[in-house]
Amino acid sequence: MTQAVLRFMREQRSGRIVNIGSVVGFVPAPYQGIYCASKHALEGYSESLDHEVRQFGIHVSIIEPGFTRTNIAQNSQIAGRPLQVYADGRNRVLEAVSQNIAKGGTPLVVAEVVLDALTSQSPRSRYPVGPEVKFVSRLRKFAPSSLFDRGLRRQFRLDPA
C-alpha cells in the first residue's frame, strides 16, 4: 500500500502515512514472538521511511496501542504442535492477555489517535495510545532492565525466575 501511494505523495510534496503498530513493537510479549517481531519490524520500517520521505513533505507515524477490546485473542493462531514443556507458562500468558484485552480501551480510542496523527499540524513519529502505553514507553527507556523484566513477568503471570 505504501509503495502504491508514495509516488503521488512525492509529486504533490505532501502526505501522511500512518502505520498501526503495538506496544509489543517496543516491549516483549512472551509466547507471542512472531507477532512481536512483526511489530518491531514495523517500528523500524516506519522510522526509517519517515527519514527517507520527510524531504518530500511526507510524514510517517506509528500508532502504538496497548490492550484493546478486539477479537485478536480469538483470531490468533496457536502453533500447530505446541510443545508441552511450555504449556503452563503459555496458558498463564494467554489468560492474562485475554483478561487485559477485556479491560482494554475501545477501538474508537485508537481511531481517534489515528485521526490526530493524520490531521496534526506537527505530526509525531510515535503515538502511544492510552496512559498505560505512555507509562510503559517511558519505563522501558529509563528503568533498569531488571526492574522492567520483573514487571513484565508479573504482568504476564510468569514466575520471577
Cite the ranges covered by each PLM segment.
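Active-site helix of classical SDR
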Residues: T2, S38
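A short helix-coil junction within the Rossmann-fold of NAD(P)-dependent oxidoreductases
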Residues: A4-R13
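Active-site-adjacent segment of SDR/Rossmann-fold oxidoreductases
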Residues: F8-M9, V27, S48-I58
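Rossmann-fold scaffold of SDR-type NAD(P)-dependent oxidoreductases
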Residues: N19
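Residue(s) in the substrate-gating loop at a strand-loop-helix junction
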Residues: S22
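Active-site loop immediately N-terminal to the catalytic Tyr-X3-Lys motif
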Residues: V27-I34
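SDR active-site lid
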Residues: Q55-R124
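Short-chain dehydrogenase/reductase
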Residues: R126-L139
